[in-house]
């Protein structure tokens, strides 16, 4: 499915992908990740980028419920993406968060939730609504009642975006904030 945006991000086309389509575009996706997270704000080191390319993304492609949105600019270049999958106990992120939050929060939020693993927008496309378009397009394609994600501290550029979409913090530790959104609750 493909949508042209009628907002400042209108120079981009959003497309929804399943695991096979995402795997076919892996080279472009990985280049976009490298470009997005090598900027001055994020400054992800080479080791972290290599881990994403060689281990994390290939592993995530195989997770149940994997779904992705990608954005291509008018030149056809992939300039952003967002993806997630069904989070379960026994997976790294779910277990990492579960060990750091109150058991009642764990029971309420984790296991069977849709987990947003990455939202990446290349620097030249930031501030135009593309991150919002990628995330909302992905969420609109999902039916899970709970969505969870983690971002850097509250001063992360993405934090206000998540809050504006109805995500609320339910964990705050190790320089990260864990946010969740119940789909049966309207977003702001």
Where are these regions (language model features)?
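Short amphipathic alpha-helix that is part of the acyltransferase structural core
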Residues: 2-54, 68-78, 86, 188
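A generic secondary-structure signal
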Residues: 55-59, 137-141
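A short helix-loop-beta-strand connector motif used in the catalytic cores of GNAT acetyltransferases and
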Residues: 57-70, 87-92, 115
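Conserved acyl-donor/pantetheine-binding loop and adjacent beta-alpha core of acyl/acetyltransferases
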Residues: 83-120
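Conserved glycine-rich acetyl-CoA-binding loop
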Residues: 107-109, 114-133, 154-160
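Conserved beta-strand-loop-alpha-helix junction that forms the acyl-donor binding cleft
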Residues: 121-126, 138-139, 143, 148-159, ...
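Conserved active-site tyrosine of GNAT-family acetyltransferases
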Residues: 162, 167
